[in-house]
UniProtKB/Swiss-Prot annotation:
Conjugation of reduced glutathione to a wide number of exogenous and endogenous hydrophobic electrophiles. Its EC number is 2.5.1.18. Pfam families: GST_C_2 (PF13410), GST_N (PF02798). It is an enzyme of class 2 (transferase). This is Glutathione S-transferase D7.
Amino acid sequence: MTPVLYYLPPSPPCRSVLLLAKMIGVELELKALNVMEGEQLKPDFVELNPQHCIPTLDDHGLVLWESRVILAYLVSAYGKDENLYPKDFRSRAIVDQRLHFDLGTLYQRVVDYYFPTIQLGAHLDQTKKAKLAEALGWFEAMLKQYQWSAANHFTIADIALCVTVSQIEAFQFDLHPYPRVRAWLQKCKDELQGHGYKEINETGAETLAGLFRSKLKQ
């Protein structure tokens, strides 16, 4: 039985899971949920995932949500390249730290700044813009450490962070103050180009950015 992924194509967390699945050759049964119309609140989905969020993975009865957990699970269960999520606990801890930085800081500040406009048509908050710039500055400093975000090789942290930063880029946030971030992002794009980057991530990022721009004009 093929693992089932409940998702929405433009969602950044969903895109990261789709990119990894493509990279490691995992076939997923895709079930789209339109969260803008409340499809995630249907009783059968709430029964599956009480938090009723996407992405949600159902792999033979093992139900997981939170995209970064799903990334780690898919590599552990199906991946052949140990480098994507190292087994060495010290190396893995760095990958985990970057994933948590993405979840709790960088991506969260993207959501805080842009999503009130996307969802409610609210005006942009300059304080939240400054907080996003601050998080990008921290990431810029982190990139001094390794050739990639968490190691001297590509990991699942790069996938998660690439989706976040490419979405920031699609929103036309000024990335010029962050040369390491820009160079790293281009490396990620090159690495993922043969794994559906354009159709999965670039298209989704532009869809979400287009929705943002349309709300901004209202």
